[in-house]
């Protein structure tokens, strides 16, 4: 709900459990309060913001909703032009779930419209800014917005993630003290070195204290800053990265920034994660339909793809219960390595002499859907596409363009390149019965200089969005998985347009526990594609040999198989079939339920992750042991989110336990050797009353 109290000059945004108050008494709107719900009738409890000294006048500016560079503000700003801007509130427009505050520059150069949307059930507020130029103006910073943390006696700690290829989503913390913490990407995509979200929390653990989350829906270069002043004002800003940022706006041109999402929880970081997971499932592309168990043939064949071998793999995949068969890189052009063929999106006639239809028909007859890997944004120098259009890549004048993984990046800011990519994808989806695309991007964006070509990086991302949006409208039944050499493009901008993410090329089950911990801080398990693979030989990830351990780690998200199943023994085939069948019985709990990170792999030799159905009648508990010293005794694992007076049967032990017992006394870990693991499925049961 949104209320505008004109007399008190207050705009109040309310969700089920939170309030966000915006004061309009000052020349520009300020954030008065964001936190647990408060009563509108108590508006007079806010004290005036006083000056401190002649060195620190107009301290209300530290609380601005959208601070701009005006020559008078000393803190970080959200908007900066080539001239100072003096914005004043012009009018406020309120609808049931959306509000707009229109600000006008005193000199009439531009207009800023702050847009707010509320998602009440998830306690999420979406913010963005629409900029309209009244005359030509040069922008060098353009954030989505700002928000303020409340003054608390407990200090705030920032929680965020860092990483690199094959080591994404490593959790980090930092105290928010005087100064500035800056998270960012300058690589042309949202990761993998950092990810566009920040959580400020003051609890002792995941289930206590308050937590405030900020996430940005943008898949290009971004920045999030958390700044703290000596007067106790702690502001978080988020938006497109202003490093080498230039946007030349013409008169009457308008632009809306990427959305910024705010979420607050009084139940700690864990509750905040669950709210964001609900938001992503209910309001973004993920939806709530079950994710299919897939098989991807990449690790079985690499580039040596051929129809006959793929059909054999498909038969074995179907036998073990796979629902979606995916052919990865190597099916097109002269693609026998990563050195050639990228960009030539026609089926290789030597590998598929009867066309791709033969394999697709075979897959469908086996009862599976068919999927395909694509990398539409890249091109090899050794390709027909590049030889025909060498001007279609990002490049600097008088400079040899840089290759990464033997490829260039196509310049999607050019309309003809965007049109080519869209037509190519339309052609594939219209020609073949494809229900899934894995969209990859295996390099950073280089050879871009915005002082020469303003807004080029951003135009690339906007073109990417237009293509994905068009495909979503024209092919609503096709799921797209976002991939960028692993988890370099996981963000809410892609989550609005793709069904799931490939979060890392590292499929080592132990490493994945850490990656999945960091990922689920902000993103839903339903969107997390997890594979069971062979123990790798290339050294970029360390394998754990036990298939059960590998399956249990991969079952914590959307299960996939990436192993070379042609080499599995009969016993291993049976094991795969049993584990896949078991996952299917409770995958809805994992994919649509509430997640509790009970014990973190970064803090304990035993990691524990629990998923609880929304009606609290079903739960799945995963336990993973890293190592154990001789005689070491582990504390019981206390479950969360169950009904106290309900009894639950456990499929692993065959016993029945009371919800209150499992939450208060806890369960014995029951793990023994290094890299041991367990999965326990609990279902509510009715106990028969004994006769007196």
Language-model-detected regions and their locations in the chain:
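Polysaccharide-binding surfaces and accessory modules of carbohydrate-active proteins
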Residues: 4, 9-12, 29-227, 243, ...
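Glycan-recognition surfaces
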Residues: 380-419, 461-566
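Short Pro-Gly-centered flexible turn/kink motifs
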Residues: 247-265, 677-685
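Carbohydrate-binding surface patches
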Residues: 198, 206, 600-643
